[in-house]
Every structure is written in structure tokens, then in C-alpha cells.
């Protein structure tokens, strides 16, 4: 006997403290995460933290301060118009105005030359190591905003991504699957529609979730159970990239010595800090990108808290205590 499997086609998502759905103007982390379904960058970063081409089909470093970017004009905006080089220039110009969280990405960009409809040359004021990683900001359409102020426009933003904005109505935003998405054959969504409900405060969102008005939300609240209880829902924990750390002034006579910094590292009980301060909701790390990263080498990781190792590290290098 075969059981019929019901495929969920719609999803209700909650977001609090909403500002704008425009990815270049929003400062809301949850909005920016959703925007990745709608808008796309020239380059993405994969699960191993390596760069992958997205809207760009080529990215070439032609000198220490210049890059040639080629795009695919077959990538289409929501209205069916093609992605063009002018869109890249337009987006970077908007970011240079300094009103976006992505503005830092183009801080060293001094100019964008349009070589043809599918090619731009990006010029930098100085060499930026791994500049390709800066090209992860969403691209916006130039022609769509002709004749108006991008920062105050009331138009519904459009992108080239997997989903498109169908409607914005008060405290509700509806996204629908982009059936003409350029990458649909490789990475299609099983969800057809996403209903986004907006809340002025996180407390309202929690209450709405408990009442069953939304299906999913994300939070960094480590005491979440105090607000929504412990039953009636499933929780998925996702490791983030934010971390607390101790920074050393390596120009100091003593701290400039590697053995001193290493000894201090051994002497700090990070596991106890996670337990007593963060209620075991965080994990210890020896490297800023210690998972899913091709640069991470487990062989170089310290053994963690070890007072005896801390002392022996100092003694082995001629220190007395």
C-alpha cells in the first residue's frame, strides 16, 4: 500500500522590525536573508566558503587594481528585460552613496567602466586581497529606476532570483516562485508561494507563532523557550558566523611574541564561558571560519583550555613565572 505524500506548496514566514524589502537599503538581517531568494549577486559563496559565479559568467583580475566582469544577458529581470552591464554600474554607484550595509564592499572602487552590454571593468584605488569575495552584493536594475530617486522610490523592487515579489499590502508581502528563473532546471523550489507577515516587535511575532498564524521564523534569542514554550514545534539550530573574540595588540613588546598569545589562549576556559555566560547556546572555536571552510586545518587547532600546556609553552620559550 502506498501512502500519498502531501507536498507543502505555501509557507508563512514572520519578520519583526521590518524596514524595507529593498536589499540595498534594508538593515534588517532577516529581510536580507529573504532577499537572497529574490535578488542575486555577481558572485556567491558556497558551503565551503569558495566563490562561485552567479550573475557573472566570468571574473578576471587584469591588474592589482582592476577586474573585468562579464555577465550573461540571458539572465532576466522579473519584467523579462535582460540583465545588462549598466545594472552593475548602477548598483555600485548606489552602494557608493554609503547608505547600504554592502557599501563597505565597494569602498575601494573608484570607477566602473562599461565596455559593452555584458562587460564592465571595475577599478580600485588600491589592491584589495580576495576582492572577488566583495562582489556578493545584490544587483539592481538601472532602467527600472530611471527618472526617480532610488532611495525614496515606492516601486516594488524586482530581481533575477528564484522568487519574485507578487504583492506588498500593508503588513503582508507575498512572494511567488519565478517560473522563468534562469537556474530553475538546476535548483528549483518546492515552495510555490511565501507569505511574509510583518510585525513591529519580536514579541508580537512570538505570539503569532504560538497561535499558529505563521509557520516559521528565525531568531538569535537563546532563551526562546521562555516565550514560545517547548512543545508543538520543531527547532533547527544553524551555526552562524558571528563570534566574540579577544584581540591582541601585536605591536606590544610582550604580546607581539607568539608564545605569549598561545599561552593566553591555553589559559582561557572557553567552554566554561559558553556554559556560564551563553547558557550552552554557543560553541567554542579556534578559527573565525572553523566549519565549512577550505582554509580550516584541524591540525593547527589548539587543544583548548590547558593550564599546564600554557605554563610549559612559556617555560619552553625561556619565560619564568
Give the predicted meaning of each segment.
Residues 57-99, 115, 121, 254:
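Aromatic- and charge-enriched surface segment that lines or borders ligand/interaction sites
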Residues 181-226:
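Ligand-site clamp/hinge motif
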Residues 72, 176-182, 238-263, 267, ...:
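A bilobed periplasmic-binding-protein/Venus flytrap-type ligand-binding module shared by bacterial periplasmic
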Residues 14-63, 93, 158:
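N-terminal lobe/hinge region of extracytoplasmic solute-binding protein
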Residues 28, 135-189, 193, 203, ...:
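Gly/Pro-rich hinge or "lid" segments in bacterial periplasmic/extracellular proteins
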Residues 7-17, 66-70, 88-91, 120-121, ...:
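Short, well-ordered beta-strand elements
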Residues 60-62, 104-146, 167:
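Surface-exposed binding/hinge segments that line
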Residues 256-321:
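Append "and occasionally in soluble cytosolic enzymes with long acidic Gly/Pro-rich linkers
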Amino acid at each position: 500500500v502506498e501512502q500519498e505524500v502531501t507536498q507543502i506548496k505555501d509557507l508563512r514566514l514572520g519578520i519583526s522590525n521590518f524596514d524595507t524589502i529593498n536589499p540595498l537599503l534594508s538593515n534588517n538581517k532577516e529581510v536580507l536573508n529573504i532577499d537572497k531568494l529574490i535578488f542575486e549577486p555577481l558572485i556567491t559563496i558556497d558551503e565551503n566558503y569558495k566563490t562561485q559565479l552567479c550573475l557573472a559568467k566570468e571574473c578576471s583580475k587584469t591588474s592589482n587594481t582592476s577586474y573585468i566582469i562579464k555577465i550573461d544577458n540571458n539572465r532576466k529581470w522579473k519584467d523579462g528585460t535582460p540583465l545588462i552591464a549598466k545594472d552593475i554600474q548602477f548598483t555600485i554607484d548606489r552602494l557608493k552613496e554609503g547608505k547600504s550595509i554592502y557599501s563597505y564592499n565597494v569602498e575601494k572602487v573608484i570607477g566602473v567602466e562599461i565596455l559593452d552590454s555584458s562587460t564592465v571593468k571595475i577599478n580600485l584605488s588600491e589592491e584589495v586581497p580576495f576582492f572577488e569575495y566583495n562582489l556578493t552584493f545584490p544587483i539592481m536594475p538601472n532602467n527600472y529606476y530611471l527618472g526617480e530617486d532610488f532611495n525614496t522610490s515606492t516601486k516594488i523592487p524586482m530581481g533575477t532570483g528564484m522568487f519574485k515579489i507578487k504583492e506588498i499590502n500593508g503588513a503582508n508581502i507575498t512572494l511567488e516562485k519565478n517560473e522563468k528563473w534562469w537556474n530553475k532546471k538546476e535548483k528549483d523550489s518546492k515552495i510555490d508561494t511565501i507569505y511574509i507577515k510583518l510585525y513591529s516587535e519580536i514579541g508580537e511575532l512570538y505570539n503569532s507563532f504560538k497561535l499558529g498564524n505563521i509557520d516559521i521564523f528565525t531568531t538569535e534569542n537563546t532563551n526562546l523557550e521562555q516565550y514560545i514554550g517547548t512543545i508543538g514545534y520543531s527547532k533547527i539550530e544553524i551555526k552562524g558566523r558571528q563570534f566574540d573574540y579577544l584581540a591582541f595588540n601585536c605591536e606590544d613588546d610582550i604580546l607581539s611574541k607568539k608564545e605569549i598569545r598561545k599561552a593566553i589562549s591555553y589559559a582561557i576556559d572557553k567552554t566554561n564561558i559558553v556554559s556560564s555566560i551563553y547558557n550552552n547556546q554557543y560553541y567554542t572555536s579556534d578559527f573565525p571560519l572553523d566549519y565549512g571552510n577550505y582554509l580550516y586545518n584541524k591540525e593547527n587547532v589548539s587543544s583548548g583550555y590547558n593550564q599546564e600546556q600554557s605554563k610549559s609553552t612559556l617555560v619552553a620559550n625561556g619565560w619564568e613565572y
